[in-house]
Design a protein with these regions (language model features):
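Non-transmembrane, membrane-proximal soluble domains of secreted or membrane proteins
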Residues: 33-39, 55-88, 101-346
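Transmembrane alpha-helices
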Residues: 1-66
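Alpha-helical transmembrane segments
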Residues: 1-12, 82-99
Length: 346
């Protein structure tokens, strides 16, 4: 029934529009074609001016109403550079937008058809063509220059002392791996992936560098004011590491590692105070449609001080010991203390 009413309303609207158009034709015939055209031009010229004024007011109003919806201050040093590029682009294109739109609609109103003047047609003008070629070229050169300057800073090599974290996307979640004290991520092989044997990352246990690697899911911890280099990959389909608060994103491609680096500027607690949101968290999202569960690929990033990070890391057990409990010294120690008690009981 609802579909029927929608179709009926659309049909009625079409008929009304058609009848108005036909009535306008009859009026034009009665009043004379030339007089009708001039009157129509005058009305359209006035409406264009109204559209310009209402449009500019609308642009201002929308910006005022929606400015609280933006992400706010960037939380990384690279984010500052990216926002700066955005502001430069908006400034240049904004000047062009307002200048051209105001001129376009004002000229349409001012130079509407009139019996007092006749249109002059410009077949060619070298000076005019030079102006509208040189000015856009200069503007684009400025944009490209700033873009390349900041781009090389953002995509350059990470500092040698940068913290390293492996980020792997899967349907539908995130996995993180931290190198241990050796600061080297161990080797892995996709055929070794076996969550049932506590080896979800496919680590090669024969590689000593894997013996102290820490494995995590859905939550990544970073240190404030310390550069971090992300080594990014995927298990199944293409994902995309989206770090909106840090103004960064990078594709996660199966079999082809990608990297990016940045330096967090504020801890999670500091950003919560800045935003006035006590429950604020940094998020990692998948910015590439990856399947039916794409919406659920939300991870959490905790930015904290070095002391807090060290305490958190100290409480984590290397995945090698989780997968090979017989190699865990703490378990052996517990067993050794229990055996004499068993002997005494006997």
């Amino acid at each position: 029934m609802q579909t029927f009413f929608i179709i009926a309303i659309l049909a009625l609207g079409f008929l009304i529009t058609f009848q108005i158009a036909k009535a306008s034709e009859y009026v034009a015939v009665l009043r004379g074609e030339e007089k009708t055209r001039k009157q129509s031009n005058k009305v359209n010229a006035f409406l264009l001016l109204v559209f310009l004024i209402v449009g500019l007011i609308g642009v201002y109003y929308c910006n005022e109403q929606l400015k609280g919806k933006i992400l706010g201050e960037p939380a990384s040093d690279h984010g500052v550079l990216i926002d700066r590029m955005l502001y430069i682009t908006i400034a240049l294109t904004g000047i062009v937008f307002f200048a051209t739109q105001i001129a376009l609609f004002w000229f349409s109103f001012k130079y509407q058809e009139s019996d007092k003047r006749k249109a002059f047609f410009y077949p060619h003008n070298n000076k005019l063509e030079l102006i509208w070629t040189v000015i856009p070229a200069i503007a684009l050169t400025v944009l490209v220059g700033f873009g390349l300057f900041y781009w090389f800073k953002i995509t350059g090599d990470a500092p040698k002392d940068a913290m390293q974290v492996e980020v792997v996307g899967k349907q539908f979640g995130w996995e993180f791996r931290y190198p241990g004290r050796d600061k080297i991520l161990g080797k892995k092989y996709f055929k070794n992936i076996d969550p049932a044997k506590n080896n979800p990352a496919g680590q090669i246990w024969e590689d000593p560098a894997n013996h102290d690697d820490i494995f995590m899911e859905q939550e990544m911890h970073l240190v404030v004011n310390k550069p971090v280099r992300l080594v990014i990959g995927a298990k199944d389909v293409i994902h995309d590491v989206g770090l909106a608060h840090f103004r960064l994103k990078m594709d996660a491609v199966p079999g082809t590692p990608t990297t990016m680096w940045f330096t967090p500027k504020y801890t999670t607690k500091q950003m919560a105070e800045k935003t006035g949101k006590p429950d604020f968290v940094y998020e990692i999202s998948c910015d590439q449609m990856c399947g039916k569960g794409h919406y659920s690929m939300r991870g959490v990033i905790v930015v904290e001080t070095q002391e807090e990070f060290d305490i958190w890391m100290a409480g984590k057990k290397p995945q090698y010991l989780v997968a090979n409990p017989d190699k865990d010294p703490s378990i052996k120690k517990d067993t050794a203390t229990v055996q004499p008690l068993a002997a005494i009981i006997k």
